Structure formats: structure tokens, C-alpha cells
Amino acid sequence: MAAQRPLTIALVAGETSGDILGAGLIRALKARVPNARFVGVAGPRMQAEGCEAWYEMEELAVMGIVEVLGRLRRLLHIRADLTRRFTELKPDVFVGIDAPDFNITLEGNLKKQGIKTIHYVSPSVWAWRQKRVFKIGRSTHMVLAFLPFEKAFYDKFNVPCRFIGHTMADAMPLDPDKNAARDVLGIPHDAHCLALLPGSRGAEVEMLSADFLKTAQLLRQRYPDLEVVVPLVNAKRREQFEKIKAEVAPDLAAHLLDGMAREAMIASDAALLASGTAALECMLAKCPMVVGYRMKPFTFWLAKRLVKTEYVSLPNLLAGRELVKELLQEECEPQKLAEALLPLLANGKTSHAMHDTFRELHQQIRCNADEQAADAVLELAQ
């Protein structure tokens, strides 16, 4: 009698964040189905968990229109080859992890061949290009969403979606140790501390750094003991920031950090940051914040017409109200930013109320996402 084929899960991850999610999912699945087989496009973490890599993740990790166009032929070849090989393999479930421009079409190809498909991490369809939801619905059997308002959006369009909570909320403690973080960064326990996070992209650092630095200078006048910490994502962004600081605020003492954004947030009394995932991480660090964002006028004009949400920051979208002050475009200027940050640095009622709400929101999205994702995969595999 032929041996029964082990549970076979195909996965495609296109960048580091997807590799981390994929590794967590594989770990959770192996705990329940030890002989399961995992194949696809994987990074080093997924491979370390036992995923057989038909292609290296770096093949898909291209950013920007110019880079994508330069690699388009190769990307299309990989997608066609994966469609053929997965169709021959007939995995029990295919999981496309993020990388929506690559994965959603691949999921559609496989669904037509009778393969069950999951898209793990919802694209921001609730915010812009909402019509993508119809293609997602045609291409997948299930979307796994990090945030409850994402599931509510898919429900409106009758697209099967499961809210699994956020892996970052699982990884971060409900009550972070501020003094321990300060010890790591060399910041006195009794000092006021402000984190500046001017973004991870070059354009963001260019547009925001000067205003953020001038804001810190204004706040230092009110709080002479103010410690300023600036985590920067890589050496390139650090060099860019240092150049701007030398022009705008050469005398402002600041701790420039290589990475360590999470430690900086936990250590700080308040943060001034660009929108994006950093705002969610800051909420989970229980650090009161102000979001400041500026873009080129035409880009902003276009964004206002395309973006369908009332708020830009994830804490506000989760809360359904303006929990965090958002100062955009001409509002994003030092005087207004400083005025918004002052009550947070005072560590009074405003920051305590924000902290308590952050903790409630953290609990809402702390659902053991790896296990929930594994549940969804196994249910679909039956």
C-alpha cells in the first residue's frame, strides 16, 4: 500500500517581514503536523524552519518602479514557473505572504487549478485602490488580516477573511520596562525623553528631518533636561539625517541610534514620527506620540483623492477616532508639532489616558497570530 503523502504547504514570501511571518507559521504548523512538507520561495528564517526553497526570497525583493521594470521579465518567468510547478505538486494549501503584486495573481492562477489559496497580510485596500478587493476575492479562498477593521472591510464585500491579530502585538509586552530601555540607551531615569522617527525612506527623511529637529529645539527650551533619541533604519538614512542636522540644528545634542527603534520608543516619554508601521509599534511600546507627515504637493493632492480613510495612522484607525494628533503638510511645522508634544512630555492626564487606550488596543490585537494562521491553513486543508 502506497504511503500517504504528508501535508504539503506551498508558500511564497517576498521580503524580510514575510520571511518572519512565514517562519512563525511553519513553526506553528510543525508543532501540530510534524511531518508536514513546506516548499516555495523562502528567506533564511523560513529555510531554517525546514522550508525547501525553489527560489531565494531576494529574487522577489525589488522596490520602486524602475527596479521592478528592470526585473520584470525575470519576475514573470518565476511566477509562470511557480504556477507550473505548484500545479504539478498540488499542495494542500498555497499561502502567499504579503507581496500582493506578485502573489495575488499567482493565487488566482492556482485557484483556477483547484488549489486552495490563502493571502496572508491584507494589502491596504481599505485605504486606497479599493477595487482590488474584487481581484483578491476571485484569487483567494481566505485572507488573513492583522487588524479588525480590515476584516470588517472584507466582510462588506463578502470576501472570506479571518482576523488573526498582529504578530508584533504578540511579540511586545503589554507593560514594557521603560527604565530597562533607558539603561540600554544610557538615558537617565529622571530625564524627559523624546524620540524622533523621521521615516525609513529617503524621501521621508528629506521632507521631515528639519521640522522634527526644529521641534526638538523648541521643546528643549521648555525642558532643558530633554534627551533626544533618533533611531535610523540603516547607515544611508543616518548619513542623510546627520547632513540635515549639521545644517539645521548643529548644536542639538541627540543620541543617533543604528536601528533600536523599539528600545527608543519604550524609553521615551513621547515620540514624533512619520506615519506607517512605526506608529503601530509606538502604540505597542505605550509611548504617547504625534504623527507628522509631509509629501510633495502633487503627491499629497493625489493621495487626498485616492485615500478613503479619515485618518492616516494605525492607532487612530484602530481606535476609530483621533487618539493621536496627526499634523500633515502645512500643519507639520515646528511650532504646531511642539504644541502637540508638550502635554505628552508633561506625563500628565493626556499621556496617561493615551497610554491606557494603547494598552486596550494592544490587547485587542494580541491573539497569538502564528497559531491563528496555522488554524486557518489546517481548516482549509481539510
UniProtKB/Swiss-Prot annotation:
CDD domains: Glycosyltransferase_GTB-type. GO terms for biological process: lipid A biosynthetic process. Pathway: Glycolipid biosynthesis; lipid IV(A) biosynthesis; lipid IV(A) from (3R)-3-hydroxytetradecanoyl-[acyl-carrier-protein] and UDP-N-acetyl-alpha-D-glucosamine: step 5/6. It holds the Pfam family LpxB. Its EC number is 2.4.1.182. It catalyses: 2-N,3-O-bis[(3R)-3-hydroxytetradecanoyl]-alpha-D-glucosaminyl 1-phosphate + UDP-2-N,3-O-bis[(3R)-3-hydroxytetradecanoyl]-alpha-D-glucosamine = lipid A disaccharide (E. coli) + UDP + H(+); a lipid X + a UDP-2-N,3-O-bis[(3R)-3-hydroxyacyl]-alpha-D-glucosamine = a lipid A disaccharide + UDP + H(+). InterPro entries: Glyco_trans_19. Keywords: Glycosyltransferase, Lipid A biosynthesis, Lipid biosynthesis, Lipid metabolism, Transferase. It is an enzyme of class 2 (transferase). It comes from the Bacteria. GO terms for molecular function: lipid-A-disaccharide synthase activity; phospholipid binding. GO terms for cellular component: membrane. NCBIfam families: lpxB. Condensation of UDP-2,3-diacylglucosamine and 2,3-diacylglucosamine-1-phosphate to form lipid A disaccharide, a precursor of lipid A, a phosphorylated glycolipid that anchors the lipopolysaccharide to the outer membrane of the cell. Belongs to the LpxB family. This is Lipid-A-disaccharide synthase.
